Amino acid sequence: MKKVLFSLIAVLGLTTAVFAYNYDTNLPLPGNSIADAKLQENTLFTAYMFAHRVASPDCKDFAIVDTSVSKERVDNKWQEVWTIKACTKTATVPINFELKEEGGMYAIDPMGVRVTSSN
């Protein structure tokens, strides 16, 4: 019984931690993304996790404020840069996309994430 109670408390604690942030999840995203809404949705939280790396530790509010195509679509592969506002900082997150028969795929290069402004 103690083990179950401890597990339940741990899960509740993790749930609270996960929802302690405010993420803008409105789709379609602003800007010129050519990823469809489903691919944007699948990529959204991964992009936000990379924005956490550059945000201030006390930052709780995150929003994608722009998207742009940085490498044009060739053979169903392209790259976009998503601009994410994280409180007083703005970060650019480069995302490589690829469409295959089984669906869309994406990859983020962690070394490509950059802070572009800080207030």
For the regions a language model picked out, list residue spans one by one.
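Sec-dependent N-terminal signal peptides
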Residues: 4-16
